[in-house]
Amino acid sequence: IFMPQWVEGKIAENIHWTDNLFTLKIDADIDKFAAGQFTSVALDIDGVRIARPYSFLNSPDQRPLEFFFYTAIEGKLSNALVKLKVGDSVWIKKQANGFFVLNEIPPCKDIWMLGTGTGIAPYLSILNTPAVWERFEKIVLIQAVRTRADLRYQEVIANLENQFEDQFFFQAFVSRENIEGTFHGRI
C-alpha cells in the first residue's frame, strides 16, 4: 500500500514576534508523534520542494501543530514561510522523527533542558506532557537568546512555574542586553 510521505497543511495562524522570529500554527493530518520529535516542513519554490526539519512546539495531544522559526538571512524556506497567510498551504511530512524524547533519557532524578533561540521548541513540547512531571523531581529550563525581544513563550513558562513551583525552575540568558532577572551572557 502506498503511503504518502507529505501531507498538505493549512496555516491556521502566523505570529510575527520580531523581524526574525515567527510561529506558524498549522492544521495537518499527520501520524502520532512523541514530544521532542521533529518533522519536515516544506514549500514548493520555483518548482522545487524545499524542506527543512523543525521540532514540534506543541505536545502530541495539542492541535494545531506549532513550530517556532528564525528567518535565516539566506534562507529560502524560512523567508517564504514567514510570508504565509491564514489558509495558505504548506507541506508537512506525515511521520515524525527523532530520539530527543523522554524514553531515551536514562534514569535520573533531575533534568536540565538547555535551548538557544527557537531551540526551546522541543522542550515546550515535552513540558506540555504529564510524563515529564511524573518522572523527574526537578526540571530546569534554560533559554539563551540575544535580546529581550527574543524571549518568547514567557507566558507558557510562567504558567509552568505557577503550576509546578517546587519542581520547575526557569532561567533566561540574554547576550546582547542587560535585562533584570536574566543572566547576561551565553550558554
Predicted regions and their residues:
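Reductase modules of NAD(P)H-dependent flavoproteins
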Residues: 1-7, 142, 147-187
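Ferredoxin-reductase
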Residues: 2-88, 175-176
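Short, Lys/Arg- and Gly-enriched loop/turn segments at beta-strand edges
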Residues: 47-54, 97-105
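A structural signal for isolated positions on well-ordered beta-strands in alpha/beta enzyme cores
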Residues: 66, 91, 112, 140-142, ...
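Acidic/glycine-rich phosphate/pyrophosphate-binding loops and surrounding catalytic core
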Residues: 91, 107-110, 124
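Conserved S-adenosyl-L-methionine
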Residues: 108, 132-139
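Ser/Thr-glycine-rich phosphate-binding loops at phosphate-binding pockets of nucleotides
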Residues: 116-121
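Histidine-anchored nucleotide/phosphate-binding helix
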Residues: 122-132
